[in-house]
Each structure stands twice: as structure tokens, then as C-alpha cells.
């Protein structure tokens, strides 16, 4: 099989993103380019104790977090997080990571039995950062939460729904984004597959455009088709 890894990432976007150091030192004698950017690798599953994500206006404090990857969201930065060690005090851990100050509003929810923790920092009425953590990987979709960063001030409905991670307005939750190029979510893809509207990679591209851009989501689309 093949493993795709973004080769131009650096320490700004990931905790261990400098993968070029692993590339074989076999280069073209003229251009100096590596051997078609090809290197044999061996991979194994990462056995994490928890995983989650944080949305922040600025930078997240990532020191001590075993796995983190940063990407640009809607008026915020999105961090995907995981670690093999469960913090002893989630509230203290989150306050440090999200940059809590005395004047800030702090919302949080914790269910120790299921290993879920959620927190949000509100500053001067607007959402400054939020954190969602789960032991089993069951996390809310990011889209609606990201949209809150565009609001100059959170209304009462948004505040009440914030830690639920779900919009108070009824609508289809398309799930975690699979195709970044066209913002197509997992739930939307599964719906098209289970209803028989997109049973091939080509059909998915025609109906939802997923997989017709950069192509990096094609392996995940194939897995959804195989399991659908």
C-alpha cells in the first residue's frame, strides 16, 4: 500500500511534522531531488488514551501534548489533538492550553465515566477558544463551532448549544469533513452511499464533487464505499 504525508509541513503545523528527515538520502545527481519523494515506511496504530480538537483565535499552548496538528479554520485555527496520558485535572489543563484569564467567562462540561470533556472561553462576549475531548473518538462536527468565531458576540441560543457542539437551528449535520476541497462531510457521503445515490468513486465525484480536487481524500472515500 501507500502512505500519504504532507512533506512541506514543519513545526508550526504539527508536533512531529518534519517528515523530510525520514526520506532516503538518494537524490538525483543533477537536480538534487529525492528519489521521486519515495521512501519505504512501516506504520502502526497510535494507541491514544484520548483524542480531541481545539478551535482558537490565536495559538494553542501545545507543550507536553504528544500529538497535535494545526490547520486554518474559519477565522480560527483548528488543532487536532491526542495523547497516551490522561490529564489528572482536565479543567486546569484546558485553562492553560486555551489561555484563560481572570476576566474571561469559562464554560465547561465533564463526564468522567465516558471520558468526555468540553470547555469554552468567552472574552468580551465573543468566543475566543473551545476544546472538545473524548476517550472513544466520538466528537462533534467542527463546522458550526467554527462559524461561531465570525460572530461579534454570542447570542443566548449559541451559548446554550456551545458545549453540545450542535447548532440550535435544526438542519443536517454533514459530519466530519472528508473532502477539504469541497467541504463534504462523512455523514453526507454515507447518506449518498446508503441511499444508493453514489456507489462508486466516480458517482461520488459527480454528485458531491468529493475526490475531484486534490485527490487526497480518495483513499478515505474508497474505505467508505467498502464499508457502506
Could you tell me what each predicted segment is?
Residues 2, 8-12, 48, 114, ...:
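Short, glycine-/Ser/Thr-/acidic-enriched flexible segments
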Residues 2-104, 108-112:
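Long, contiguous, secondary-structure-rich segments that constitute the structural scaffold
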Residues 2-8, 220-228:
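Long, compositionally biased
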Residues 18-50, 154-188:
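Cysteine/selenocysteine-centered motifs that mediate thiol-based redox chemistry or coordinate metal-sulfur cofactors
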Residues 35, 52, 59-61, 82-85, ...:
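Catalytic cores of large soluble enzymes that bind and process phosphate-bearing ligands
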Residues 69-163, 171:
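C-terminal catalytic lobe of FAD-dependent flavoproteins
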Residues 164-176, 194-213:
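Immediate flanking context of iron-sulfur cluster ligation sites
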Residues 175-191, 206-226:
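Local cysteine-cluster metal-coordination motifs and their immediate loop/turn environment
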Amino acid at each position: 500500500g501507500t502512505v500519504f504525508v504532507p512533506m512541506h509541513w514543519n513545526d508550526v503545523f504539527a508536533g512531529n511534522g518534519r517528515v523530510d528527515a525520514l526520506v532516503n538520502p538518494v537524490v538525483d545527481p543533477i537536480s538534487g531531488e529525492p528519489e521521486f519523494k519515495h521512501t519505504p515506511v512501516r506504520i502502526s496504530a497510535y494507541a491514544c488514551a484520548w483524542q480531541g480538537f481545539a478551535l482558537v483565535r490565536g495559538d494553542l499552548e501545545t507543550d507536553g501534548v504528544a500529538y497535535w496538528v494545526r490547520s486554518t479554520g474559519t477565522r480560527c485555527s483548528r488543532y487536532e489533538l491526542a495523547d497516551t496520558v490522561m490529564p489528572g485535572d482536565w479543567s486546569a489543563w484546558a485553562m492553560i492550553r486555551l489561555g484563560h484569564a481572570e476576566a474571561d467567562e469559562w464554560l465547561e462540561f465533564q463526564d468522567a465515566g465516558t471520558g468526555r470533556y468540553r470547555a469554552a472561553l468567552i472574552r468580551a462576549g465573543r468566543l475566543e477558544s473551545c476544546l472538545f475531548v473524548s476517550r472513544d473518538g466520538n466528537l462533534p462536527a467542527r463546522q458550526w463551532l467554527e462559524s461561531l468565531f465570525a460572530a461579534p458576540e454570542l447570542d443566548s441560543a449559541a451559548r446554550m448549544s456551545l458545549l453540545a457542539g450542535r447548532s440550535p437551528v435544526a438542519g443536517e449535520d454533514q459530519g466530519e469533513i472528508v473532502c477539504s476541497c469541497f467541504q463534504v462531510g462523512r455523514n453526507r457521503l454515507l447518506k449518498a452511499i446508503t441511499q444508493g445515490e453514489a456507489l462508486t468513486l466516480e458517482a461520488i465525484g459527480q454528485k458531491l464533487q468529493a475526490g475531484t480536487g486534490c485527490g487526497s481524500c480518495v483513499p478515505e472515500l474508497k474505505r467508505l464505499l467498502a464499508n457502506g
